């Protein structure tokens, strides 16, 4: 594999997101795009002598690079290395190695010492390869390195490698526990991604390592801090289940974000710093170390110890707002009091798991676990109890705690009460029990002027639906009094409002005309929107009317009279209406013509003789007036049922605060037992299905075949199921016995001509042995038909 320096595309812009290795899977394969270019920083005349000497040294080192070919070896050319404009493509490799076919080139060897001249490479993406971490240690300015999906198992890193590396992605590899410990010597590593490495445990000395015996003296022990600048650690999608992993991570002093999603963690343990009572113990914790180092130890100190001045010393002090909590104060921060130097932690950050009763409260000489941790995520784990999460209260800087998709919150609603009252309300820790769904990006569509619709659609006016009435015809009536009973009958009969109003209009319109010439206006049909039609009919008829006579009532008088309508006129039988009309006409003809009509006041009450039979007993409803203040309730039955339900089942709102003085019932998870799926029968072939169909067609359905002995002997066991078969078999057996006796008696009668002895005689076989042999013979062949059987 070949390597190069700063990479630029044809447009002159750097593409640092995916510059190693060069890929064109997600880009359009254009001419000249996706290749590696070696760009000179400037002319050789403007470069300093040191840089020119470095390039000359590189040129000499490249001369010694060997290239193996298939069957032959050739030396490479010197004048084609530093020439600008050379592209690492197929033509360059074929011309540079003097081969005709690409299959002739087997190996390209590029030394790692060549990378030290590329001072501007800060990011390398080498994921989905088979490259080790050690292949990139010679890049002097490398800050970000992505080595995901490389199958890395072990790591070999020395002091002085990757001095400026800050971001390292080793996701989805196969790292061992020892390989993770070897990464602790990187001095400036801030972000470490270890997702999907199949880790089952973490080393106990992950944060602190004991110095080798060859370096330390026999009278003192020294410890070296690991991961001095680590702030973000991703350990999700592993197999961590032991609570000791928290003890391994608690000593990381700069850790601010820790992700342990998709593991098998059950609880968080209570942690406390280990106290070492040996006076000779010393650790390289910074300026607060009480013991001085020997001179030979300073000389042999590795690169890691040279950067100890950058490590901050902290002091554990009680908080002013809450005495139960502690805060960490760093000596390098401004405003730090020098009078508190006696409380600086002089013990190595090694933590152990202790029960709650064994913790030493308010011990200011001990450092708290995770002193700077602000974000902790334990989603998709197996935490089922609230007590298993309470130890996060000992983390002094924790601000956000994520625990969604755990059994603790999977089967309940809301934040658990103990965590809400103690962690959220008292300590101010933000609890996240639900997965935060990221909002989707809004898609912005480009607006073109040609797409804009400029035409306006006129609004359709809202007009009521008008029904066309039949045309009016003029007819001659014999007298004026013949139409008055019709109007009175239309007012008295129970009809709709529109019908009652329209029935009065013909009588008003006919005033002023002679009795011999009047216009007849038929009533319009009854419809749902009767009010609209009545108003239109009134306006239509007002054009053809004349003045009202003083004898007729005015419009105000007609409106003042109100009526109650029980049903429509169309529901009455035509024979009843016709009969009532004739009776009313005869009654009006007998009245004197000078008698005035009384319209005002209460409406006339019809006699019971003129009402249909189904209205008998309801005459008072025709003259009663509704109460104007009465409001008819809607859905009174449902309201009554709802009121009864509320009275029987009152809603009691309990307090959301937990009752700490009472015993709480622990949550017991009920496992769902899935029913066993029955094993499906073997699939039959087409020939077997056809055979089954032919058998069903051939066998009669009214005959059931069963062995006689099985039915008779198994009746006691399957009495309820085969009781009918048992009775049928018993009847057939009796019939067979009777038939057998008839056969024997008939055969004996034809042979001897005399009446045989009864079958129950015990001395029959002894006195007449020939009859006994004959009976045995008949027992064997009783099923064969005989002539006597057919005659009988």
From Swiss-Prot:
<keyword id="KW-0433">Leucine-rich repeat</keyword>
<protein>
    <recommendedName>
        <fullName>X-ray radiation resistance-associated protein 1</fullName>
    </recommendedName>
</protein>
<dbReference type="GO" id="GO:0016604">
    <property type="term" value="C:nuclear body"/>
</dbReference>
<dbReference type="GO" id="GO:0010165">
    <property type="term" value="P:response to X-ray"/>
</dbReference>
<feature type="repeat" description="LRR 4">
    <location>
        <begin position="188"/>
        <end position="209"/>
    </location>
</feature>
<feature type="repeat" description="LRR 2">
    <location>
        <begin position="141"/>
        <end position="155"/>
    </location>
</feature>
<feature type="repeat" description="LRR 1">
    <location>
        <begin position="104"/>
        <end position="125"/>
    </location>
</feature>
<keyword id="KW-0539">Nucleus</keyword>
<comment type="function">
    <text>May be involved in the response of cells to X-ray radiation.</text>
</comment>
<feature type="repeat" description="LRR 5">
    <location>
        <begin position="229"/>
        <end position="250"/>
    </location>
</feature>
<dbReference type="GO" id="GO:0005737">
    <property type="term" value="C:cytoplasm"/>
</dbReference>
<dbReference type="GO" id="GO:0005654">
    <property type="term" value="C:nucleoplasm"/>
</dbReference>
<feature type="region of interest" description="Disordered">
    <location>
        <begin position="490"/>
        <end position="517"/>
    </location>
</feature>
<feature type="repeat" description="LRR 6">
    <location>
        <begin position="254"/>
        <end position="275"/>
    </location>
</feature>
<dbReference type="InterPro" id="IPR003591">
    <property type="entry name" value="Leu-rich_rpt_typical-subtyp"/>
</dbReference>
<feature type="compositionally biased region" description="Basic and acidic residues">
    <location>
        <begin position="549"/>
        <end position="560"/>
    </location>
</feature>
<dbReference type="GO" id="GO:0005634">
    <property type="term" value="C:nucleus"/>
</dbReference>
<feature type="coiled-coil region">
    <location>
        <begin position="723"/>
        <end position="745"/>
    </location>
</feature>
<keyword id="KW-0677">Repeat</keyword>
<feature type="region of interest" description="Disordered">
    <location>
        <begin position="537"/>
        <end position="562"/>
    </location>
</feature>
<feature type="region of interest" description="Disordered">
    <location>
        <begin position="577"/>
        <end position="601"/>
    </location>
</feature>
<dbReference type="InterPro" id="IPR032675">
    <property type="entry name" value="LRR_dom_sf"/>
</dbReference>
<keyword id="KW-0175">Coiled coil</keyword>
<feature type="repeat" description="LRR 3">
    <location>
        <begin position="164"/>
        <end position="184"/>
    </location>
</feature>
<keyword id="KW-0963">Cytoplasm</keyword>
<dbReference type="InterPro" id="IPR001611">
    <property type="entry name" value="Leu-rich_rpt"/>
</dbReference>
